[in-house]
Amino acid sequence: AHLDGLSDPSGYLAQLRELLGPNAWIVVEKILAVDEALEPTLPVDGSTGYDVLREIGGVLVDPQGESPLTALVESAGVDYQEMPAMLADLKVHAAVHTLASELRRLRRCIAAAAGADHPLLPAAVAALLRHIGRYRCDYPGQAAVLPCALAETHSTTPQLAPGLQLIAAAVARGGEPAVRLQQLCGAVSAKAVEDCMFYRDARLVSLNEVGGEPRRFGVGAAEFHHRAATRARLWPRSMTTLSTHDTKRGEDVRARIGVLSQVPWLWAKFIGHAQAIAPAPDAVTGQFLWQNVFGVWPVSGEVSAALRGRLHTYAEKAIREAAWHTSWHNPNRAFEDDVHGWLDLVLDGPLASELTGLVAHLNSHAESDALAAKLLALTVPGVPDVYQGSELWDDSLVDPDNRRPVDYGTRRVALKALQHPKIRVLAAALRLRRTHPESFLGGAYHPVFAAGPAADHVVAFRRGDDILVAVTRWTVRLQQTGWDHTVLPLPDGSWTDALTGFTASGHTPAVELFADLPVVLLVRDNA
């Protein structure tokens, strides 16, 4: 369960820590805003890793794709600059309609605590929630969030001042009104963001992930390194993850979709052609679903009955969650039938072979990003979690798709053979963590910078003194330009790649370093 749904998260965790003892590993499922840090007073080891998931996926996104992909989604009639306003309206709708019973109960609590009621009190609560950009804001380190939100709400809607004053008076005393306001805040955020907005934003859907912020087009290397170093210092035992039971897409599906940031012109051409041949019932819905179809499309082009069923199930869930033309509470069967018919046309018509060709063209780049993400998740500061089935390529979408039974027999065979690149990375990194625990759990994080024309295509860092990790990114552009004398300066000593056995020292050419795989896991010899 999410931490923020509890009435007293801090008190609960204090009791849990006392019960389990000082050495028990406790991490909390907490969705952090981009500008929010985990509360340092909580007696836990960290979060379950949605924050790290955003950082890893984001650092592999090509920023050059932002403008053309924004233009593409706006060609479908969306003003992308209005997305924040849309999200704010969704929060109000969630409070007033979806969670109306909770809002009524909160109103009664506030009125009782403040000793007065007002007709505008429910509207004031809903408007206030528009301005709280996180799931919960009553942790000690966030004491300034609520008064700032009250000020912003008063500034934009001064007519709600009487209701806002009642809220402030009731919440200041703590107790049930304060608790229920925070619980409603988290529920409203979940309904508006995860359960609706993430199904409307069709710019680059790999960014529409739990803990994500799609309006930020990826994560720069500076931000990535700073957040990793901070985690090493403050939360070295926090969890890192790429896939969970709640992620909107599996890690490898996100990696493939993320490649579209590198080829926006190619994707725009495909979408334009697709819309001419098989126009979607709604252009934005079509762009959203096309990215997901691309993300799970088999390299062979052979769409099994199982995949067809999974895609139809996903499409129906997606359009109901988006709640533009249909919804769970008010299904529009005609629109849903049109979407299912369109999807069958996509799967069976001439576009299927074109999509197969596009997937084949980009698959090596998708696999490169997937390997990079996996190695980063296993080696950045924190304790890595490997979600069920993600040891090999995984084509899962949202639940229940990501909760299918795992074929452990196939994975046991792959682990023994160590031929699959993903399980090679996984096995090597986990073995290294076991033999060098001081480098990972206690070791510092130090960025390492490549030098040369293609330096931006490398993300590298040291863990402790004896482990160096480097991954490749933006490989479509890299394929065109080549490494062009780019080097990675290795610290003193001789280094061996735990994945390939390649040995290097000093200023090592990137073309040699990444000759076999797009990632390296270097260990200092005799360490």
Regions found by a protein language model. Name each.
Residues 133:
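Acidic/aromatic/glycine-rich contiguous surface patches that form carbohydrate-binding/processing clefts
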Residues 8-80, 87, 93-99, 113-119, ...:
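Carbohydrate-interacting/catalytic domains
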